Structure formats: C-alpha cells, structure tokens
Amino acid sequence: MVIPRYHLIPTNCILSYHIKMSYLTDILKLFSLETLDTRLYPSSNTAKKQSIIKQANPKSRWSTIEFKFYYLVFLIIVPLMFKAGMESANENNPNYPKYEHLLSNGWIFGRKVDNSDQQYRFFRNNFPLLCLLIIIHVGLRRVINRIIPLSSKRTYFDFIFGIIFLIGAHGVNVLKLSIHLLINYLIGKYIKNYKLSLWITWIYGISSLFFNEWYGNYTLGLSFLSTGYTGIIPRWDVFYNFTLLRMISFNFDYLERQQKLNNMTLPKEESNGSLLNLDDRERLTAPLPIEDYNIFNYISYLTYTPLFIAGPILTFNDYIYQSNYQQSSSTKDYHRIMMYLIRFIFCLLTLEFILHFMYVVAASKTKSWEGNLPFQISMLGMFNLNIIWLKLLIPWRLFRLWSLLDGIDPPENMIRCMDNNFSALAFWRAWHRSYNRWIIRYIYLPMGGGGKYRILNSLLVFSFVAIWHDIELKLLMWGWLVVLFLIPEISVTMIFKKYRNQWWYRHLCGVGAVINIWMMMIANLVGFCLGTDGMWKLLHDLFKTFDGVRFLIISSGALFVGAQIMFEIRESEMRKGINVRC
C-alpha cells in the first residue's frame, strides 16, 4: 500500500506552521487600517461595498514571482537605508563634534538621545505628567459616574473639568481666550441673517489669528495679566488655532441647523429627526434639538480636555451626539482599544530608537553633512521627515487614546505611514485626516467642492491652511505651490484613467509615483530638513558625481518597487471593500 506523502509530515510541524501563521495574522491585523478606526471598516452599505470590490483586481499578486523579487529588494534595501541613516549622523561620523552639544543623556544602552526638536521635546519631557492627567481624568469620570448618574449628560463633567484644566494650563490668560470665545458665540447666536453670520464668523476667526500674532501679549490695561500666574503653558495662543476650528464648527453647525428648521413646515416637536444609531457621517449633520446649541454645551465642547491641546478635531454635532445621546460602540470595545494602545507604544518606541541611534535632527540643525555621500545625505533627510511624521502622530494618538478611554471616538489623524505615500493628493487626505475632514465640511464643500472651480477652491483651502499653521509669507507661498504641484497629477490621472485595464497601466503609474515621491521629498526636505543649502548640495552630488548618479538610478528603482507594494496594499484593502482614497 502506498502511503500518501502528506501523512509523513509530523503533526507537530503542521501545528507549528499554523501557530506561526496565526502570529503573522495577528501582526498584520495590528497594523491594519481597521485597527486604527472603525470609520475605516468596509461600508455597511452592501451595494457600495460590492462596487469597491469590483474595482479591485480579484487576483492577489502577493505570491507572484514579481512580488517575490520585490521582497528580496526590500530585504536588501531597507537595512542599507537604516545603516546609511545611522552613519550620516552618529558618534562615528566626523561631523559629530558639531552637533554633540545638542544631544542629551538617553536611556537606551547608555546612548545619547537627540532631543533637539523643540516641539517634541516639550511633549517628551511632559509625557509622564500627561499620563498622570489621563489617569486622573478617566478615573475621576468613572468614579463620579458611579456616584452621580451623569451618564446621560456627560457635558456636566466636561464643563467643570475643562474650566479647571484651562486655568491650570493658561492661568490668567484664560481671560484673553474667553474674550474670543464669547465674541464668536455672540456672532453665531445673535446675528440672525444666515450668510452674514457665517461671513462674520470667518472674518473674525481669521482676524483673531493675526491679532494674536501681532498683539498676543496684550494686557487690556489690567496689570494682573502681566504679573499674575500664567499657568503651565503661558503661550495660550499656541493652542488657540485648534480652539478656533471648534469655534467655527459650533457656529456653522448651529446656523445650518437653524436654517433647516426655519425651512421646515412641520411642528417643532416633529422637526427633530431620529437620533438613533447614526454613523460617523450622519453625526456631522445630526438633527439635534436647537436647545442643544447653548453656551454651556459650547464651553464644554471647546474645553473638552482630551482633545483640547491638539485634537483630533471633532465637530460640535458629533461631540454632543456622542456625549448626550449615543456613545460609539468603539469606545466599549476594549480589545480594539488595547490593540490601539499596543500600536501607540510601538510607534513611541520606534521614535525613541531613531532618536537614540540617528542624530539626524541635530545634524540638520547644524548643517553637519560635510563629507557625507549622497545616499547618506538623502537618508539624513528621509529619517528627518519620518521623525516629523512620528512627532505629530504620537501626541495625536495619545490624545485620541485618552478620548477613547473617556468614551468619545474622534477621527484618526494619521492612517498611513509617511513612507506609504505615492500621491501628493492622497498624501493630504491621509495626513492630519480630522483637519482634512473639517476643511472639506466647512470650507471646500460650501465653496462648491470639486466642480469647475476646483483649482480656485483648492487655492482658498491651502491659503487658510497656511495662515492657520503660522502667519508667514513663506507658508502662504508653500500653500500655493502645493496647489501648483497638484495640477500635473490631477491632469495626468484624468488623461490616463481610461487605460486602467491595460497590462502596462500599473507600471506606468509606478513611474509616475517615482516622480511624485521625488518631488514631495525635495519640497519637504527644503522646507523642513536640509534647507536650500543642503538641498543644493544633494542635487549637485546626485547629478554631478558618479556616486550620486548611481544612487539616483538605484534609488529610483527601489522607489518603483516600493510603489508597486503600495499599489497592492490598496488593492488588498479594496478586495475587502475598503477604499480610503489615499
């Protein structure tokens, strides 16, 4: 009798294989889109989900010979990138004495840490204090909810804790902030003309940014504003920009709701629609009773502590709906929250590793790249960009984690790794996603959206984005240049879209992606890392030295491979019915 060959495979080998596959599945799930935000789940609308699935290639390419070659490229190139990044700025680099003074004592293997970035240093140094505040806030909420049945009106707790937090954070400067809050509230509530009220809201909001920039230290003739306690964070105006977004959201949501009610012919008690089981999009225009748009809820929303410092940005309607009507089921799924916590810790440790082994921020601050090879200079810049991404991602995820633990689910801000981008247009959808959603709702769509005025509307959007970030001419120019860079991508996409079913289309897109990535890297390296001096040196070395030309060719090939992997990641998501358009 012939025994089938598979009977000869030991049972323990099969079991070991299944365990390994189970671990791999868990790791892939941990880093999936769905782990980040339930908003990124496949659509509950069956027709919409099937429409997305039909757009994807039904056959996966992950096991093809082509992609096995790509895996080999990854195994070679990625370690070399880390090696070059370390060599470009560590203690063995000849330029080390130029930036050694910017380094601090670290905690990993007795190494120094590059804590020279001012923004992240503030967060990193105050991280234990923030964790303590989270424990106090979440713990106090749960204790009080057990003692006093406030679960139906969470805003009571938010109002009291928010005021106390604000005084502790900004001290007497709370008075300056309060003036802005009150003026905005009066504009929204007491100017009855819908369009006029919206225009004045926008004019006052943008004017307040300029006023704070030019006269931020005003005292209103009150001596205690200059001599009194100014809190843990004396620069109250630094966080005002996020508060302004919430101020505009309240006025817009209130005026929109009032307008709808005025146009209705139903009795008042019948004019409120259903408030049951609204999804994230429906919550943006939730049919709240007009009485909910009051000064108490306004202050509770603006001072909601987990999201006050830097967001993510939640609209007024969404906040009130989740607070007083129906909490999102995601805030009760503690397994998902634990997965989110693990992913946060992974990102935190990743940044700590980079800061301990690659002193690229300090090197770029002192322009210490003399003698480095083109590959090393480019990795110095690339890891700088990764640090910028991580230093924003980590606070945003901590604040969102805090909010989830507290029972409110705001949108996830960063849904793609910075290195997982090949399109400038898609990049802006994935970067600071809650801000992008806010802009679409309150600026882009009211101005007409993506119709015949798409370019003009985009100019308006990026002008506001630039002013909101900081009032500098170079940022305004940056905003306009972004729109200029988007035009070729939009045009080429429209021209070649009809060929998407051709065998060569994916490879042509790969070439376009390489050009796009180079353009985005150059623009961001100039603006945030190397400056014009470093960029000119890199470009000179790329095109006028043998090592540079060789690196340009090899790196472009590696970027092409990376782009193909990015394409297939998105195809895999679409096969599950997920299309986040970035």
From Swiss-Prot:
Q: Name one Pfam family in it.
A: MBOAT
Cell membrane in keyword set: yes
Q: Which superkingdom does the taxonomy of this entry point to?
A: Eukaryota
| Segments passing through the bilayer | 62-82, 122-144, 159-179, 196-216, 295-315, 344-364, 374-394, 455-475, 476-496, 508-528, 549-569
Which UniProt key words apply to this protein? Cell membrane, Endoplasmic reticulum, Membrane, Mitochondrion, Transmembrane, Transmembrane helix
Q: What is its main location?
A: membrane
List the subcellular locations.
Cell membrane; Endoplasmic reticulum membrane; Mitochondrion membrane
User: Which residue ranges are assigned to the Cytoplasmic compartment in the record's topology?
Assistant: 83-121, 180-195, 316-343, 395-454, 497-507, 570-582
Q: List the PANTHER family hit by this protein, alphabetically.
A: ACYLTRANSFERASE, PROTEIN-CYSTEINE N-PALMITOYLTRANSFERASE RASP
State the function annotated in the UniProt record: Membrane-bound O-acyltransferase involved in the remodeling of glycosylphosphatidylinositol (GPI) anchors. Acts only on GPI-anchored proteins, but not on free GPI lipids. Also involved in lipid metabolism, having profound effects on sphingolipid-sterol-ordered domains integrity and assembly. Involved in cell integrity and apoptosis.
- UniProt-listed GO biological process terms: GPI anchor biosynthetic process
* Protein name, per record: Membrane-bound O-acyltransferase GUP1
Q: Which segments sit on the Extracellular face?
A: 1-61, 145-158, 217-294, 365-373, 529-548
Keyword Chaperone among UniProt keywords: no
Can you name the source organism?
Candida tropicalis (Yeast)
Topology term for the membrane: Multi-pass membrane protein
Q: Which molecular-function annotations from GO does this UniProt entry contain?
A: O-acyltransferase activity
